[in-house]
Amino acid sequence: MKVWVHFVFSLAIGIILYPIFGWKALFVLAGGVLIDLDHYLWYAYRHKKANFFEAYKYYLKNLEKNDFTSDIGILLVFHTIEFLALMIVLSFYGEAFFLFTIGLLLHYLLDAVFLYFVAKRLIADYSLVHWVLKNKIQKV
């Protein structure tokens, strides 16, 4: 899903929550948008290039061209159940973590809707443990 969609939806939820949480509502925006940095981290690891704009262009061009299958099996650490569990635990210890987790959940929801209706599939590797075990088994 394109970053602007995550931005718009996260901004809308942040605006709704602003009267309650004030400026901290910006953490919803951070949680809803910044977790896609793991796409960049994977690109940098896989292609040995640290160019953010090249990574962005790569994902925009290749995902749709390959019918949204070129990202199957990649590890997106911020899109894992373990990261979500960590954020849920941390959300009990501060408003900022709580609001970030709201943005994160919104991001996951938008990704799930996109994957189901547009890419016609569900998330492939939703767990860090699953990804490590699967890749370790495949290498043996």
Enumerate the predicted regions with their spans.
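N-terminal membrane-targeting hydrophobic helices
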Residues: 1-140
